[in-house]
């Protein structure tokens, strides 16, 4: 039986001024898929994943989530982003908050959870990525690899159906890359649906069930 279709990207185009970055990209993501997007620098990989999360609004084309056009159905994109989470290359943690608070804030403000419930969920996912002993640390006290693991836990705490990752290891020192890739590998084994922009070719081959190669804005 074919797996449930979660995301469908159809003829996606994105221009910045006169420059067309994405020139008609189409692909589907089904439950349990791990799709890696690879390609040379400047090919449009990060623009594509930012469009899927609506951090950039596509110039043309559609993105359907569970058969419904995101642009039409989710007037509040915040709710869509709880279903389709995002991990950034630059972590995007709140520097004035502890590790635990970073993983709680979205649950309370967006999902309307109680602080107690949010804390329980946050601790669960921090433990999952091996960061539960750092709950009271601030981001500036962490290494790059630790920050990225916290960022992954924060995204997981919203319990998304699809997790998008934009070059999750590109801002890390080489010795930190392995610890983050290990976490992502574990998530893949557990069946989490993911779309990952990466330049780690061996990792893409190892972890994904589909690789999309983008060059000059096309697949």
Residue ranges and their predicted role:
Residues 4-7, 13-219:
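ABC family nucleotide-binding domain
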């Amino acid at each position: 039986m074919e797996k449930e279709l979660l995301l469908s990207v159809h003829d996606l185009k994105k221009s910045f001024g006169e420059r067309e970055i994405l020139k008609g990209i189409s692909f589907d993501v089904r439950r349990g898929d791990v799709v890696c997007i690879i390609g040379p620098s400047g090919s449009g990989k990060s623009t594509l994943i930012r469009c899927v999360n609506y951090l950039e609004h596509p110039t043309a084309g559609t993105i359907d989530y569970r058969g419904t056009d995101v642009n039409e159905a989710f007037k509040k994109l915040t709710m869509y982003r709880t279903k389709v989470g995002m991990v950034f290359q630059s972590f995007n943690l709140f520097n004035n908050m502890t590790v635990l608070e970073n993983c709680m804030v979205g649950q309370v403000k967006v999902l309307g959870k109680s602080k107690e419930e949010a804390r329980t969920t946050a601790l669960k996912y921090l433990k999952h990525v091996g960061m539960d002993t750092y709950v009271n640390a601030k981001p500036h006290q962490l290494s790059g690899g630790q920050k990225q693991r916290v960022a992954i836990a924060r995204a997981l705490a919203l319990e998304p159906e699809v997790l998008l990752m934009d070059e999750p290891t590109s801002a890390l020192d080489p010795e930190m890359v392995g610890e983050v890739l290990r976490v992502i590998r574990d998530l893949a084994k557990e069946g989490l649906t993911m779309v990952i922009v990466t330049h780690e070719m061996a990792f893409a081959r190892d972890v994904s069930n589909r690789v999309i190669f983008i060059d000059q804005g096309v697949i």
